[in-house]
């Protein structure tokens, strides 16, 4: 019984140490921001993530920051181009797989005069993020693809008016942009 108690105590201590190491880079917990709003989408059977994104892009006036693992959605790419055409500062970070992917929006976006860089440092740049006017953020499992909208079980989360969350995503976007080519 004593050996078992010592083993449990050791396991608890090891688990605590492991937990601290694992979560040391996580932001501290904080309450939702007063006045902030949150929207979610679940596809393929719930609210359209693609429509949510296109609407947010259409309402963007100053800056649009994008991080994408896979970006092949024609409606989303067209909305991004329209944003650029009306004077929005659009910048995009893509995973290296998008350089050779057959239907990637990378070439379309570059041809539209949009700054597109490739994040080659991690094994996979698996982010799916858009930051609109440094005021709202969309993130989730939703890749910016037709398959994500129509065939996959995906989710998205739009945070509007929570400056702390938006700032964290902008800071991360800037860091990924800094190390991309």
Region locations from a protein language model:
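Short, structured motif recognition centered on aromatic/hydrophobic residues
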Residues: 69, 129, 169
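Extracellular/periplasmic catalytic domains that process cell-envelope and extracellular macromolecules
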Residues: 33-34, 57-59, 85, 109-110, ...
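DNA replication sliding-clamp ring fold and its partner-interaction surfaces
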Residues: 52, 56-62, 165-167, 173
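Short, small/polar-rich loop/turn modules that mediate ligand/substrate recognition or access, typified
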Residues: 1-44, 50-51, 98-100, 174-181
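Solvent-exposed loop/turn segments at secondary-structure junctions
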Residues: 70-74, 96-100, 122-125, 136-137, ...
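Signature of lipid phosphatidyltransferase scaffolds
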Residues: 136-181
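Structural recognition of the beta-strand scaffold that forms the well-ordered cores
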Residues: 41, 65-67, 91-95, 117-118, ...
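Primarily the HKD phosphodiesterase
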Residues: 55-115
